[in-house]
Amino acid sequence: QANKIPGAYFAAAPTHDQAKKIFWDDLLKFSLSSTHVKRPNLSDRIIHLNSGSEIHVLGLDKPQRIEGIPWKGGGIDEFADIKPDAWESNIYPALNTVNPVDPDYRAWCWLLGVPDGLNHYYDLCQKSETSQDANFKVFHWMTSEIFPEMAEDAKKVMSIKQYKQEFEASFETAAGRIYEDYSTANHTTEVIKEH
């Protein structure tokens, strides 16, 4: 879309380092940045497209980094790991910053990631699934539908709750999560053997 509708776009993650590792190199390649008239800004992590659009790579460890720019759209990976109040305090208001040059345009945002207990991501997904608000939708891409062999291998080494959370996008309770693998069902009488 950034090639068709000029403006500011973002690719964000919970921390600046994560955003850089997840997005920066891939976006440089996918956008064919070596062919752009204006070189990427390496210190601010901004790719300047020939269409006039900019793609900003942002860390939301300081959620105010997203504020003050009239965004066209963007995506946030690992959304469950951002600060709990960042959506309401920073991100949603930033998406609604009106561009005086294009006052009727409304920014969009993809919230990506796997669940992490019943936190702010869960609350927003529940609200999206139960409301009649056409601005919010929830989509699931389960590993078993895309990579069935990978899903089967994961089932062998993960607890049921962890598998459901990581591979089926299921919101599992956080209560007792640390201890679930230490239940009596997992006890063994096997003796550790010398090597």
Residue ranges of predicted features:
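Walker A/P-loop NTP-binding motif
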Residues: 1-5
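Conserved RecA-like ASCE P-loop NTPase motor core of nucleic-acid helicases/translocases
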Residues: 7-19
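Hydrophobic/aromatic beta-strand patches that form the interior of the parallel beta-sheet core
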Residues: 10, 58, 75, 110, ...
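Inter-Walker segment of RecA-like/P-loop motor cores
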Residues: 18-72, 171
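Short, conserved catalytic or adaptor-binding loops enriched in Gly and charged residues
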Residues: 46-50, 126-135, 182, 186-192
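Walker B catalytic acidic pair
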Residues: 77-79
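ASCE P-loop NTPase helicase motor core
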Residues: 81-158
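ATPase catalytic-site recognition across NTP-hydrolyzing enzymes
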Residues: 143-195
